[in-house]
C-alpha cells in the first residue's frame, strides 16, 4: 500500500508548503497545473492567497491528497519540475537514505529519456486514473515501504503523553523528537506528590464502590464521581482504557496530568489533591466543585440560577488568566471548553481536565498528529487548521477561549445539531472577515462592524441588560481570539478585565450616572442625507426655555402668573447655561456647524477605492 500525502507529518507539509509558496507565480502555476487540470478549481485555490494566513500550496496539496495522491507522485512531480529543494524536504523524511540517490545527483538523473517522458505524461496518467511511474532516481519498492514504515512510527498515538512526560520511550525516538535536556526515564512515585497517594480501599469507601448515584459525568478517557471522606467532598476521576490505545497509555496519561497539575499552581486552575495507581483502577482526586461546570450554569441545568453579567465577566477573566498562566509555563491545555471550566461555591472559575501538551523544544515537536474522531466532542472549540492539519500551538487554546467567551456572551451552545450551522464557531466566523487589507483604517472599521453585528444579532437577552460599551468590548475580545492570525490572549484578557471593572463600578452608581456612562446611541447625533433645515433655525430662547423646564417649577402667584424667586432664577440661569454649554466666540459662530461624512458612506468609498486597486474583490465589497 502506497504512502499517501495526507499521511505525511505536519512538520514536513509545513516546510514543503512554505518552500513552494516562495516560488514565482509562473513556477507555482506550472506546479499547480500538473496537480489540478480543472482551471476553474485552480483559479479558486489561487484566489485564496488574498486570505490572510492561508497557504495556497497547503490548500492545493489538501485537494490533491483527498484524491488519494501518493508521496511518490509528489516527489516525481517535484523532480520533473527541477524543484530539488522541495523534493529534499520530502525525501529527508524517508528512513532509509541509502536507498535513495544523493540529492547532488538529481541534475544528472533528470535527463531526456524515460524520466522526462514520465514527467510529461504525468498529467495524462492522472486523467486516465493510472498510477504514476516512479522516476529513475528512486528505487522501487524499498522507498515506499520505508516511507510507510516511517509514517507509522512518526504518527504518535493520541493517548501518548508528550515527550517530556513519557516514561519508557526508545532512545531513537527520544533523541529525534525531544531535547537532550529532558530526562528519558522517570519513576511515577518520584514525583513530589508521594504524600498525596490514596489506596484503592480509600477511594472505594469514599465513592461507595463507584456507585452510579455518585457519578457526575462520563467522558472518553475517564468518569467523574463524587465522594466524601472525613466530612469533606471530593471529585474522583477514574481513568479507563480506550479501545485501540497503546499498552501503558493510561499510566502515561495519569503521570502527564499529575505532573501538569503539580507544576501549575494558580487560583483559576483546579488543584490536584491526590492520586491512586492501583491494580484495579487508576484515579485522580480533585476538590468537589459545588456549582458544577460553566456549561451547566449557562443553560441553567437543574435548580441553578441564571448567571448575571458581572458573574459572567468574572468567570471569563479567570479563564483567560488560567490559560495565560499555562502559556507562560509553555504548556498547552488543548481542551479548553465550557464543560471544563468548573465553578466553586463562590463561582470562582477553575480550569480542569487538560490533555497535557507542553510546548515543544524543537521544530519537529511543534506538531502533534491526532485522530479527529476522538475529538468530536471538542471539535466545536478547535480551529479548522488544527482539525485538518494537526498543528498544535498556543493558538488552539486562544481560539477555544474565544468560543467560551462567545458562549457566555451570546448564550448560544458551542454545538447544536438542530441548528444551522451546527457549530457556533461557524456562525461567528461568518461574521468575522477572513480577508483584511494592510490599510489600518479599513481594518479598524471592519472590526467595529463585526463587533456591532455580534452584539446586535447574538447578544444574550435573558441575563439582563448589558451596557453597550461592555457588550462591544466583550465582542472585541471574542473577535481577537478567533482571528486567523495575530490572535492575542493578552489583548482579550485586558478587554475582559475592563468589562469586569466597569460592571463592578456600575453596581455602586445611581441609575442617572449609569445612563450617562453607558449612554444609548439614540443621544448620539448621526449624519444623514436628509437634513431638516428647520432644526438649524431654532431660536436660542426656545432652547433656553426648554432647558429651564428641567429645573424645579417656581411657586404660583395668586393671579395665576408665575413669579420666580431669586434662588429659582439662579437655578434657571445655571440650568440654561448647563444645557446650552459654553458659548463660542462671536467670530466662531458661523463655523460651529460643519458637515461630517457618514461612517458607512466613508467606509464604502474606501472599499470602492480598494476594489479599483484590485485589493478587494466584489464578494467582499457587496457581500456574498
Swiss-Prot record:
Pfam families: Death, Pkinase
Domain Death: 13-94
Chain positions recorded as ATP binding sites: 216-224, 237, 337-340
Ranges for domain Protein kinase: 210-475
Keyword ATP-binding part of the UniProt annotation: yes
InterPro entries for the chain: DEATH-like_dom_sf, Death_dom, Death_IRAK2, Kinase-like_dom_sf, Prot_kinase_dom
Extent of Polar residues compositional bias: 558-577
Similarity field: Belongs to the protein kinase superfamily. TKL Ser/Thr protein kinase family. Pelle subfamily.
Role: Binds to the IL-1 type I receptor following IL-1 engagement, triggering intracellular signaling cascades leading to transcriptional up-regulation and mRNA stabilization.
Record text on subunit structure and interactions: Interacts with MYD88. IL-1 stimulation leads to the formation of a signaling complex which dissociates from the IL-1 receptor following the binding of PELI1.
Entry protein name: Interleukin-1 receptor-associated kinase-like 2
Organism of provenance: Rattus norvegicus
Lineage, opening ranks: Eukaryota, Metazoa, Chordata, Craniata, Vertebrata
Amino acid at each position: 500500500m502506497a504512502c499517501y500525502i495526507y499521511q505525511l507529518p505536519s512538520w514536513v507539509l509545513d516546510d514543503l508548503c512554505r518552500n513552494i509558496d516562495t516560488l514565482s507565480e509562473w513556477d507555482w502555476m506550472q506546479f499547480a497545473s500538473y496537480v489540478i487540470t480543472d482551471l476553474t478549481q485552480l483559479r479558486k485555490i489561487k484566489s485564496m492567497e488574498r486570505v490572510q494566513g492561508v497557504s495556497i500550496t497547503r490548500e492545493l496539496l489538501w485537494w490533491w491528497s483527498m484524491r488519494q495522491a501518493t508521496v511518490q507522485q509528489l516527489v516525481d512531480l517535484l523532480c520533473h519540475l527541477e524543484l530539488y529543494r522541495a523534493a529534499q524536504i520530502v525525501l529527508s523524511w524517508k528512513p532509509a537514505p541509502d536507498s535513495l540517490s544523493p540529492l547532488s545527483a538529481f541534475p544528472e538523473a533528470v535527463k531526456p529519456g524515460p524520466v522526462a517522458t514520465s514527467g510529461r505524461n504525468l498529467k495524462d496518467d492522472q486523467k486516465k486514473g493510472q498510477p504514476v511511474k516512479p522516476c529513475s532516481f528512486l528505487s522501487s519498492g524499498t522507498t515506499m515501504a520505508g516511507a510507510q514504515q516511517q509514517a507509522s512510527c512518526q504518527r504518535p498515538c493520541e493517548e501518548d503523553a508528550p515527550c517530556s512526560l513519557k516514561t519508557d520511550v526508545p532512545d531513537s525516538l527520544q533523541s529525534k523528537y525531544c531535547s537532550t535536556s529532558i530526562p528519558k526515564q522517570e519513576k511515577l512515585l518520584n514525583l513530589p506528590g508521594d504524600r498525596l497517594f490514596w489506596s484503592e480501599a480509600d477511594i472505594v469507601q469514599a465513592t461507595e464502590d463507584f456507585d452510579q448515584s455518585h457519578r457526575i459525568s462520563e467522558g472518553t478517557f475517564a468518569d467523574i464521581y463524587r465522594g466524601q471522606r472525613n466530612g469533606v467532598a471530593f471529585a474522583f476521576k477514574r481513568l479507563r482504557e480506550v479501545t485501540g490505545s497503546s499498552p501503558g497509555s493510561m499510566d502515561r496519561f495519569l503521570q502527564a496530568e499529575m505532573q501538569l497539575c503539580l507544576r501549575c499552581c494558580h487560583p483559576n486552575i483546579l488543584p490536584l489533591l491526590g492520586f491512586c495507581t492501583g491494580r484495579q483502577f487508576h484515579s485522580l482526586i480533585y476538590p468537589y466543585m459545588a456549582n458544577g461546570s460553566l456549561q451547566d450554569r449557562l443553560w441553567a441545568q437543574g435548580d441553578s440560577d441564571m448567571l448575571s453579567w458581572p458573574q459572567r465577566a468574572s468567570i471569563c477573566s479567570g479563564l483567560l488568566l488560567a490559560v495565560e498562566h499555562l502559556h507562560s509555563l509553555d504548556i498547552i491545555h488543548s481542551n479548553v471548553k465550557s464543560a471544563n471550566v468548573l465553578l466553586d461555591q463562590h463561582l470562582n472559575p477553575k480550569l480542569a481536565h487538560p490533555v497535557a501538551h507542553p510546548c515543544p523544544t524543537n521544530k519537529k515537536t511543534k506538531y502533534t498528529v491526532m485522530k479527529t474522531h476522538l475529538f468530536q466532542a471538542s471539535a466545536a472549540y478547535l480551529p479548522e487548521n488544527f482539525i485538518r492539519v494537526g498543528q498544535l500551538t498556543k493558538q488552539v487554546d486562544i481560539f477555544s477561549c474565544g468560543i467560551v467567551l462567545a458562549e457566555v456572551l451570546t448564550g448560544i451552545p458551542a454545538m447544536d445539531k438542530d441548528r444551522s450551522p451546527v457549530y457556533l464557531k461557524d456562525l461567528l466566523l461568518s461574521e468575522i472577515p477572513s480577508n483584511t487589507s494592510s490599510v489600518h483604517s479599513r481594518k479598524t472599521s471592519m472590526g467595529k462592524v463585526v463587533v456591532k453585528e455580534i452584539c446586535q444579532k447574538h447578544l444574550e437577552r435573558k441575563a439582563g441588560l448589558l451596557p453597550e460599551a461592555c457588550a462591544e468590548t466583550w465582542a472585541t475580545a471574542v473577535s481577537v481570539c478567533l482571528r486567523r492570525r495575530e490572535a492575542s490572549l493578552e489583548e482579550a484578557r485586558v478587554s475582559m478585565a475592563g468589562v469586569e471593572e466597569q460592571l463592578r463600578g456600575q453596581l455602586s452608581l445611581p441609575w442617572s450616572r449609569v445612563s450617562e456612562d453607558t449612554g444609548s446611541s439614540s443621544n448620539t447625533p448621526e449624519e444623514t442625507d436628509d437634513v431638516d433645515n428647520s432644526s438649524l433655525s431654532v431660536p436660542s430662547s426656545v432652547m433656553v426655555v426648554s432647558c429651564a423646564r428641567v429645573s424645579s417649577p417656581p411657586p404660583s402667584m395668586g393671579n395665576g402668573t408665575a413669579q420666580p424667586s431669586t434662588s429659582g432664577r439662579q437655578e434657571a440661569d445655571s440650568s440654561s447655561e448647563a444645557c446650552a454649554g459654553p458659548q463660542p466666540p462671536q467670530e466662531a459662530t458661523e463655523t460651529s456647524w460643519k458637515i461630517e461624512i457618514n461612517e458607512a458612506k466613508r467606509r464604502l468609498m474606501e472599499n470602492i477605492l480598494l476594489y479599483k486597486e484590485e485589493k478587494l474583490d466584489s464578494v467582499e465589497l457587496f457581500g456574498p
